[in-house]
C-alpha cells in the first residue's frame, strides 16, 4: 500500500475586529470559548488534523487582525491559502457590509490562479445573541451573488454549527489544494505555430 504524502491546508479567517474569528478558531481546534480574548495583533494560527473523505489532512488556520491598520500585513499571510473564511457578526450590520472589501482584498493580496472559483466560506457568527440585525435571507442572497459561497450561521460561544462549517472549509480547501497540485504537475502545454514547426532547416543556411 502506497503512503500518501501529508497534506497541509492553509485556511485564512477574515472579518472585522470583534466578530469572533479567534473564538471560532479556538472553539473548533480546542473546544474552548472565552470572553477574555484580546484583539489579535498581526496574525496567529492553530493547526488541527482532520479526516476529509477518508484522507488525513492538517489544517493550518490563520486568524488575522481585523483592524484596518493591520490589513497591510496581508500579503505574506494570504499567499498560498487554500480557502478563505469570511466572518461577520449577525448583530452588527456594518461587519456584514465590509465582507465585500475583505473578499476583494484577499483576492488582490493572495492572487489565486483561478479567482473566480477560489473557495470562500461565509460564517454569520453570534446567533446566540437576541438582538440580531442581519437576516439569514440577506446573508444568503449576498453569498449567492458571489458564485454561491457556502453559508453557515454559527455561535462560537454555544458551539453551534462550528464543526459543520469547518468540515466544509476543510473539504473545499482540499479540493483547491488538489487542483493546484494537478495544475503544477501538468501545466498547460506550449503551443507552437504550425509554420514554426514546419520551417525547413535550409532557411538557416547563409550560403
UniProtKB/Swiss-Prot annotation:
InterPro entries assigned: P-loop_NTPase, Small_GTP-bd, Small_GTPase
GO molecular function: GTP binding; GTPase activity
Keywords assigned by UniProt, alphabetized: Endosome, GTP-binding, Host-virus interaction, Lipid degradation, Lipid metabolism, Lipoprotein, Lysosome, Membrane, Methylation, Nucleotide-binding, Prenylation, Protein transport, Transport
Placement of sequence motif Effector region: 37-45
SS bond list: none
Signal peptide: none
Induction: (Microbial infection) Down-regulated at 6 hours post infection, and then up-regulated until 48 hours post infection in spleen cells in response to Singapore grouper iridovirus (SGIV) infection.
Membrane topology designation: Lipid-anchor
Family in the record: Belongs to the small GTPase superfamily. Rab family.
Task of the protein: Key regulator in endo-lysosomal trafficking. Governs early-to-late endosomal maturation, microtubule minus-end as well as plus-end directed endosomal migration and positioning, and endosome-lysosome transport through different protein-protein interaction cascades. Plays important roles in microbial pathogen infection and survival, as well as in participating in the life cycle of viruses.
Name this polypeptide is given: Ras-related protein rab7
